[in-house]
Amino acid sequence: MYPDLKGKVVAITGAASGLGKAMAIRFGKEQAKVVINYYSNKQDPNEVKEEVIKAGGEAVVVQGDVTKEEDVKNIVQTAIKEFGTLDIMINNAGLENPVPSHEMPLKDWDKVIGTNLTGAFLGSREAIKYFVENDIKGNVINMSSVHEVIPWPLFVHYAASKGGIKLMTETLALEYAPKGIRVNNIGPGAINTPINAEKFADPKQKADVESMIPMGYIGEPEEIAAVAAWLASKEASYVTGITLFADGGMTQYPSFQAGRG
């Protein structure tokens, strides 16, 4: 636990499930005040809100599409209206779907790039604007992926979005470091989230994925949430412009593990 996170205001996009939900609950345990953004009426953000409160934090929910400027502005304004400020912005909302690149409709490309990359830009922009205008040494955390460095056939839109997030984060970190604003990425590997549930329910597919992870197991959302809490805390006060991979070693060329090559 990080005592300096107590009372901090954190907004998390895509927080109704998966990594976003785990991060919301972790910040609840840190006794932070959490703005839970969700996209679809099919999701139940109030369940997450209750878990955050039960964990020791405060929480509000706000619906919004991160590809829309006004919705993203409203997420930041909700934090300010409900809790008086914003300290930490976590741009977590993301999409993926497999399509052969030569068959990919432009609408699929636009949807993934819009959510993953443009959404992260809008969240970063609105948070940083507030930080600058109010002289706040705030914190932006973007959710990238191992696929900012590992090519991923059938997911060219996803890989491109994460590669874009990498350079966007590094650029923002360099631009706003003089103002004490930190901007970092988290790069998860294979994580046991709802988006992966069907794949990991198949023993063969699960084993195939595990074979690419030197540590030998698929990560849990709480392990990513722990990384987010550290990056947001004073313990990481000298850290900006990085991608912190939490991937069980997936980015470390696992095929060389047995001394091959």
UniProtKB/Swiss-Prot annotation:
Swiss-Prot/TrEMBL induction comment: Induced at stage III of sporulation.
UniProt entry tagged with the keyword RNA-binding: no
GO terms of biological process kind: lipid metabolic process; monocarboxylic acid metabolic process; sporulation resulting in formation of a cellular spore
EC numbers, comma separated: 1.1.1.47
Residues holding NADP(+): 11-35
A Pfam family: adh_short_C2
Keywords of the record: NADP, Oxidoreductase, Sporulation
SUPFAM superfamilies assigned: NAD(P)-binding Rossmann-fold domains (SSF51735)
Top-level EC class: oxidoreductase
Reactions this protein catalyses: D-glucose + NAD(+) = D-glucono-1,5-lactone + NADH + H(+); D-glucose + NADP(+) = D-glucono-1,5-lactone + NADPH + H(+)
Residues where substrate binds: S145
Superkingdom, natural source: Bacteria
GO molecular function: glucose 1-dehydrogenase (NAD+) activity; glucose 1-dehydrogenase (NADP+) activity; oxidoreductase activity, acting on the CH-OH group of donors, NAD or NADP as acceptor
Active site: Y158 (proton acceptor)
Family: Belongs to the short-chain dehydrogenases/reductases (SDR) family.
Subunit relationships: Homotetramer.
Protein name: Glucose 1-dehydrogenase
